[in-house]
Amino acid sequence: MLIQKNQCHITRTRENCDCTMNTVNEDLCLSASTLGSSSVTTQLVDPLDRKICLIRRQNDVKKRVIWGIEVAEKLHWKGWELGKETTRTLVLKNLSLKTQKMKYRPPKTKFFFTIIPQPIFLSPGITLTLPIVFRPLEAKEYTDQLWFEKEEGVFCVTLKATLPCYKLDCPSSLQLPMCALGDTVETWFCLNNVGDLPTFFTWEVPAPFQILPTTGLLEPGLGCKIKVTFEPLIAVIHEVEALCWYGKGNKQKNSINIQAAAKCAQLLVSIKHKGLEDQDQEGFQKVVHFGYVSVGSVAERQIRLYNPSAVNAPFKIEMAEHVLTKDPSFSCSTSQGIVPPGEKKCLSLFFHPKTLDSRAIDYFSIIPSGCATKTLLQVVGFCRGPDAVLQHSCVNFHWVKLGERREQTLWIENQSDCQAHFQFDIDCQESVFSIRPAFGTLAGKTRMTLHCAYQPTHPIISFRRVACLIHHQDPLFLDLIGTCHSDSIKPAILTPQHLTWYRTHLARGLTLYPPDILAAMLKEKKLERDEDGALILPIESLPMQELEDLPDQKYPNIPPMTEYFFDGTRDLAIFPPAVCLEPIDVDFGACPGPEAPNPVPLCLRNYTKGKITVVWTGRSDCPFWVTPVTSDVPPLKSIALRLYFQPSSPNCLYAVELEAFAVYKVLQCYSNIEEDCTVVPSWCLKVRARGHSYSPALEHHIPHYSLDSPQTFPAVSPGKPSYRSLFLVNKGSMLMTFSLAPNSSSDITLRPSSGLIGPGAHQVFLISTYPKGTSWRQHIFYLNFNFYPQYLKEVSMQSREEPLDLKLDTHKSIYFKPTWVGCSSTSNFTFHNPSRLPLQFEWRVSQEHQKVLAVQPSKGTIHPNENLTLTWIFSPLEEIKYLFRVGIWVWEARQSQKTKPQATVHYRIRLVGMGVTGCLSAKPVELDFGNVLVNSQEVKPLVLLNDGNCTLYYRLVLEQHRPKGLHSDPCALEFDHSEGTMPPHSQDTIYLTARPKVRSQYSWTISYCLLSQRAPPTNSMDGKKKALCHVSLAAAYPLLSVLDICSMGSTEGITRKHLWHLFSLDTLNSYLARDPTAKELTYKVPTRHSMSRTPPIFTPLKLDFNFGAAPHNALPSVVLLVLKNCGLVPLDWAFLFPSDQQLDLDLWVEQEDLNSNELHQMRAEDNSLFSINPKTGSLNPGQEQMVEFTYRHLFVGTDRLSVLFKVSHGREILLQFIGVTVKLEQKYVHFTSTIHQFIPVPIGDTLPPRQIYELYNGGSVPVTYEVQVSVLSKVQEKNFDHPIFCCLNPKGDIQPGTTARILWIFSPIEAKTYTVEVPIHIIGWNSAVVCFQGVGYDPCVMGDTAPFHSISSWDSSSISSRLMVPGQNVFLSQSHISLGNIPVQSKCSRLFFLNNISKNETIVFTWKPRSLDFGEVTVSPMEGEVGPEEGAPILVTLKASVHASFYSIDLICKVYQRELMRQYHKELQEWNEEKARQEVEFTITDRKVKRRAYCAAHEPPKKYKTLPPITNQPPLNRPATWNLKLAKKETSWPCPQPPVPGLLCLGLTARAHATDYYLANFFSEFPCHFLYRELPKKKSSKEESKSSEELPDKKGPVSRQKQQLLVDCLTSIIRGLLEDKNFHNAVDQNLVEQVPYFCQFWNEQSARFLAQKSSLYLVPILSLPPSYEGRKSKEQEEDLFGKMPGGQEDDEEEEEDEEEAEEEEEEIEEEMSKDEEDIDKDAKMTWSGIKVTETSQHSLQWQWQQDLKTIIKEETESDEKEAIGRLPAFANLQEAILENMIQNILVEASRGEVVLTSRPRIIALPPVSMHRTDNLLQMSQGDVLCSGMQHPDCLLVSASSPSNMTT
């Protein structure tokens, strides 16, 4: 391993003094990096530093502070030796501010010991050192403790000594940073050897994590840094466990939980500095345009990569594979990289074009790592070369005398931005024409002046066409003409017109004829002149077969490259040459001298039909010359010439171009010319000669040059030549020659092939080749410099024929998706141009298919390396399958559209489509908006489904079925879009917005029609609308109602029914059920809108909320209302005080003068007399909420406050809060109103019901009321002396805070309304006149509409709400029980549950007994306990009296916490004991006060003091519910008070009808009720008072005598059962016998039938005598009846019953003994009879007699049973048993033990085969089955009844 030094810092704290190794050097340890490198360098911690750290760890211990003492948690010994003592010190430091005293105990073992223990006193800040010595005797671990004792407690310090061991320390967990897929992150952590031995380690970690190094060796005290590398492949959270194995045998291990998250990286690609032609849209291919770039230069564009993810985004850039392109024009600066999270990175793209006038296209793929999609980037660039032009194409020097020199100027201009390198292909020194400068460089948009000179050496016509070679451009041509005259020779003067005629004659084949012949032919009419004056052959003179071979009459437009390469000097020429010279390139090689080299022969041929003269125009001092200088060549002849070379100086390079002019001999004299048009220019002959004078021993000077050579030839069509230009620059200071080496490829042509370049000069080459084959072909040629073989430059170029080829996608097949007839579908088709030529294409669709098939675009140009996407459009006309074959024609793109392409290629593709039909469907078909608030907005999604195979274009149509009277309103339903496109097997979501304006039921029908793309947009293909969906909506206003009301505090004495009327809740509910008016919707939601203290009211509805009356400073009157959203929409409600509606204004805006109402209102609000909690709320449909209204009795008098009750988007009701506060000791009776309405009563009712009128005493003293009944007699006299109104208790007392019930009987005799005003006097106070009204109706006329048929018409308690006080953990499952219409003397029971929702508190409940004026109500059990999260079943029973009456009862249940009750009983018991003790104590006066006081100081303090003398004081007659703030005399020792109970109220309502009346109106319901015949006796007033005063919480203790008596009785009973054999047999028989479930329901027929089947296997068992069974059943009935709650009697009657029962028991025992003897006799006779029957027929008569006795016995028993069944006692017993069974079932169902909704399961026994048909056996067996199956079930029900156990 490579070891480097690294410093680790040591960190200590007071709580933890261990050394933590945190490597901070360059963040290498426990720091993450995102390096992608896989190289690992393991760095170890400096051994010296590590050893120091470990020594400090041996000395430093972890300390703690206990009760102000700083001490170490433990002392650890390491590195000890056997038999040697090792001492460590324990430091105790006092950190508190007081002196600490402590003691310590020495260690228990003998291996640790310290100094003799002694007390330790530590002053503040003082440190004590306690030495502890360790002396080991064995090689094992030792553990002990050193204990310290203080006043606060004890603590210990652990002493531990361990053996040398292997131990490596590493972090338990390691969190690596997030990493992108394809990326790598790494983290370092420290692995320390904290053991005592050198340790080898080995790491194991699963993928994608790696740990390096995986193995190593650590010396003790050393640590190394481990690198963890994370390279994820899946984007998930990786969590692995790395294991480090070490120790002996690698059996020990450490684990590290390594966590790392892998995510997919994302890259957003955008174009920087986007241009007009760039495309940078999301979701589309991005296009970067470089524009026009000069050839040879480099253009740069940048793209921006943005990483929005939270991890690094590695990426790579791939360029499209170029199969056919060897020299790409585009490149990217970066092939791969990383973009940090949240950052941007710019990449450069370069365009360096090399092919002129071409459009380059390429593609780059930006591929992020992982699962992200790649971005395709298209780059486009145009190559633009130089555009050099000459001012003139011809320079005419006219005629010049021999020896003179003439000069003219012209300019050359570069019209492009690209730099232009030019060179004229002429040797100015050896030619009569010269151009200065002959080469140069033109910058973009520049011009240069050229000086052309003419200096002839012979009198001759001079004409030379000089090529101007330009790098990256076609050559330019300059015509130089001049004529030289001497004194003797004057040739014809050559003009530019002659050149024009010459070119025309050249095209017409007339240039091979001398002027004299042409003139003769013109005279002979063999030639003619055209409109331009040129000569032309007459057409009529030519035969017909030669007309086709007639050459072109005009000189063609020859491309510059073609003209340059095919100038006639090579084998190929455009026109036949007139004169030919060979060779044209002569290399003399080395000519060091002194001898001259041999001349080189030249051959000159004359192909004309005239004699020519050849003149060489070289200078005289030229080392190369030709002889003869002047010569004449006859027609069609050749001559031989000699080329000489004579170097002028040694070691030099020579290269020249010799020039000669050949002209017709006849033109040497202008007088020989008859026709000017026959003048022909001279022909320029050129010979390139080169050589050098270096000796072989000398090395030629080294050339310094640069050569710009391309790698490929431009793309051309097959059979066409390809041209390129090369650029050679001589960068040296000496001349440099070049020549094309002979071993170069023969299929290329290089011009010029040799030459000389001066220092700093350049040479432009043109090279051409004819590509052959579509594969790349390599051309290699060599340039030799300075005539030295080693100076050879190899140039390699490639060429190929560009085929007319396209790469078609989808394997030349296109499939259209199924298309709806009338619509169109599209399919994209992509093809690629792999060639380097732009191609033109054209799709040709047959005429018959053009209506069905189309393509866009149908024709166009595809550029090289371009991917072009076309769109095929398929529009079927029928529901059939279509098959097409379409061709595409491809040819090379030409600039001239008129030119017919020479070669075309065509491809055929196959297109398949299908025309289908389809339809739409909706989900759901029935869309219900549900309940929507009027004037609101509701949005619902509607899913459209296209299950077909084609795309559909649809339009939705809405038809509203408007409610009546709403036709003028706008449509209440809107679409977010009504038109769209649905792909096949897809769905689309349309959002419907409903805005109902009125409360009504809305319904719509949504239809659709399919659109056709062929038809106009307003029309549809299918004119029929098809129903899609039915939409319904119920527009509603918010509906709020009050369900329940409950009183607390000072209003506890008001009954619920009375309180219901005080708050006018019936009227309030009726108002809330109506629609709001327009004014009420002025402010739809509660808002501050008023500037005055009395806000304006927008509602006509006003109600009173009357809180009743209470004394001054009494408990607040609290009323709880349960609000329920009974409507269909959610709602918000609010109670707004006037201040809640007032705007917050500045003080100067408020009015100063306030009236009395405003002052009263301010007093009520400022003192919070009325409060509401909560004041606002929200309710969903069906949801309930409790609101608490509080009125505080702070001021005497009547308080009023107007509160606005606002339902958002609904009603507004003005509530008048009214509360009365009465002075103390003042009488006050609260009258709700002066009118009281009796419940309607039918006429002719002989027993009209009793009705109740309530009076509430709101004062603090009792009052006496008296109803003046004298006015009732007047009404009686007017109605035929019939008592219409009758008051049953006209006088009575009302206790403070309670309600008195005045009983009335309203008995109408006519169907009308009766009214009477009755004065009610409050004795000692005021009187009130109450108008009582009653309505009589005829039930025969009203029928089912009679008021008593609807219980809710007179009882508002028929609701099921759960009113819970905030913080209450106990509630009733039903707070109101309505029994409805019941008959008189009926017994009705209801089961409900008392639930405890607390999780840890047990509650104790007790019901307050309630006595009724008529009837009886009981609750069972009256008291009990309910555990946490449990419920107790409660049974409430109402026994109606004989009188028809109304029942409205409020039962109060007090709930206590069991712990508080236990604490109360405990304190009460202690108080009673102390009271008993103090009653017998007496006080002796001690005069020695000081001594007694001194002694008393040392006596233990007593818990209680002696009570003061007890005196009889009359208690105040005040209600227990009022906690008046009166001054009370403080007692020295108060009696413990019971805890404040929680109150639960159960409302019970019913209406009892007379039996005859009930049968007449509710006949079907009568069997559902049980009539309890025996009424309970009414208790005396004393017993009632005793029972009311008795505390239900107090239970008397059971005496020891009673307990012992109960134990003795049970013991004797159990022992008797254990010794009774009959009991054992009965138990065994019941265990063996299987009783089917259905056999419990027994009747006589089933018993007989069953006995017939089972007579073979059942023994005959005689039934008991009827008298015994009757007595037994009667006793059981009496016993059970006696246990019923209704069977309570006085003590005297109970004693008499006990005596009678004892006498009856004695009689029954005597009769039972007799009956048993009879039974034994009958059994014996039966057995003997059976035996006789088997042996003799004589006993058959006796058997018949027995059967007759049995039948008589059964009839007697049936009569007795029927008589018993009619007894009231039996009916009561039967009712009790059934009630108990049902109660047990319901209780078990509530506990989950029984599922009442499950299907019943009956298991029947298999049938038993019968062999005997004995009637006697059948009957007896039937009795046995009946008796054996009924009684156990009855006993089981009784035993399992919770009511029997509690009563």
From Swiss-Prot:
Nucleotide-binding is among the record's keywords: no
Compositional bias annotation for Acidic residues: 1688-1720
Coiled coil feature spans: 1457-1483
Membrane association type: Single-pass membrane protein; Single-pass type I membrane protein
Region entry Disordered, spans: 1668-1721
InterPro entries according to UniProt: CFAP65 (IPR052614), Ig-like_fold (IPR013783), Ig_CFAP65_10th (IPR056305)
GO terms for biological process, alphabetical: flagellated sperm motility; sperm axoneme assembly
Pfam families with a match to the protein in the record: Ig_CFAP65, Ig_CFAP65_4th, Ig_CFAP65_7th, Ig_CFAP65_8th, Ig_CFAP65__9th
Source species, domain of life: Eukaryota
Domain MSP positions: 805-914
Primary location group: membrane
Reported tissue expression: Predominantly expressed in testis. Highly expressed in round and elongating spermatids. Expressed also in certain ciliated organs, such as the brain, lung and kidney.
Localization per Swiss-Prot or TrEMBL: Cell projection, Cilium, Flagellum membrane; Cytoplasmic vesicle, Secretory vesicle, Acrosome membrane; Cytoplasm
Keyword Transmembrane helix: yes
Keywords for the protein's UniProt record, in alphabetical order: Cell membrane, Cell projection, Cilium, Cilium biogenesis/degradation, Coiled coil, Cytoplasm, Cytoplasmic vesicle, Flagellum, Membrane, Transmembrane, Transmembrane helix
Transmembrane segments: 112-132
Assigned GO CC terms: acrosomal membrane; acrosomal vesicle; cytoplasm; plasma membrane; sperm flagellum; sperm midpiece
Gene inactivation effect: Deficient male are infertile whereas female mutants could give birth. Deficient male show severe morphological abnormalities of the sperm flagella. The majority of spermatozoa display absent or short flagella and the flagellar axoneme is completely disorganised.
Protein task: Plays a role in flagellar formation and sperm motility.
PANTHER family for this protein: CILIA- AND FLAGELLA-ASSOCIATED PROTEIN 65
Oligomer and partners: Interacts with CFAP47.
Entry similarity comment: Belongs to the CFAP65 family.
Name of this protein: Cilia- and flagella-associated protein 65
